[in-house]
Amino acid sequence: MEAAQSPCLRVSVSPRPHSPNYNSLCMSWSTVRVPASSANLGPGFDALGMALGVYLDCRFRPSRRLSIAATGRDRAAISTAADNLIWQTALSVAADVRMKLPPIDLVIDNQIPIGKGLGSSAAALTAGVVIADRLLGLGWRPPRILDEAARLEGHPDNVAACVLGSIVASAIDSGGVVRAVRLELPARFGIALVVPDFELPTVEARAVLPSCYSREDAVFNVQRAALLIAALAAGSTTAFPAALEDRFHQPYRIPLVPGLADILLLRAPGLLGCALSGAGPSILVFYESGYEAVCDLVRQIFQLHGHSAEVLLTHIAERGFEVGQVPGPPAGAAFPEGIDA
């Protein structure tokens, strides 16, 4: 879903007697790569998430002082101070398990557009949980990492895609445990993103939604969500135009995204359908062929409403987060002198 652009978590960490001996840790750089994600996919409000082949890459290692460097897309929007979301997430995990986290050197190479409905904060939260898991030696498996990331995010749809990859249907059961099922997809359609030149804060996008829905609208969305999951699993593209219809969130967000009404009604050769990505304003485009022409139509609609837009050709990321190691520091990383954490 819509990844909340909330302030970074702020916690204090009390060490416990059996924290790891960080002097014995290997000082080579560890890595974590997390995919972007698109939530909702039309009718699957707060339930469906898709991992995308656009990534947040982090390198990290224990250090004497906290140092954070940011490169890549929207780097000016990424804090390199102690309130960095990735670092604060790692601290929150450490506090939760009552262990002490060492300061780290952290290099963030981001390619995910920030504030555009593409799961940038979910990727950061997932990276923070993974970093804490590695540094503290917790040995968490993906389901535990997903539970922790969903607890911090407040909903599981984006982080489920970040952790598991592909397209994921998820829910939180009555005991607070995330239940998620990953779909294995036949590759019979393409994915592209049209990213306009403005941001849409999640809190604003959620504020326009009603507090309750009619039975008619609820049945409408349940039918479409079921149809979409079946179409995705079977590789049946003929159902896409109907399966992407929605009455839960997109109609209410039309005033916030200039051109959205026309984009959702767009029909063209090779186009399977469009959906608002998460809370928006980016548009997720499903196509069979001719993505350039299809995406150009979406871009032209934004232009008619006074906004430029960028087309990103991408794909469904089959893998969720991945971890590894590299022998030396990343080239060209410029660190501040140190941060008082």
Language model regions located:
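Glycine-rich, charge-dense phosphate/pyrophosphate-binding loop(s)
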Residues: 232-341
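A generic local secondary-structure boundary/capping motif
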Residues: 46-49, 150-160, 178-184, 229, ...
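Active-site rim beta-loop-alpha module in soluble metabolic enzymes
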Residues: 192-255
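ATP-binding N-lobe of GHMP and related small-molecule kinases
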Residues: 23-116, 130, 134, 138-142, ...
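Gly/Ser-rich oxyanion-binding loop with an adjacent helix/lid
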Residues: 100-179
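Intrinsically disordered, low-complexity proline-rich regions
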Residues: 7-11, 15-19
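Short beta-strand-to-loop capping motifs
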Residues: 62, 172, 196, 285-289
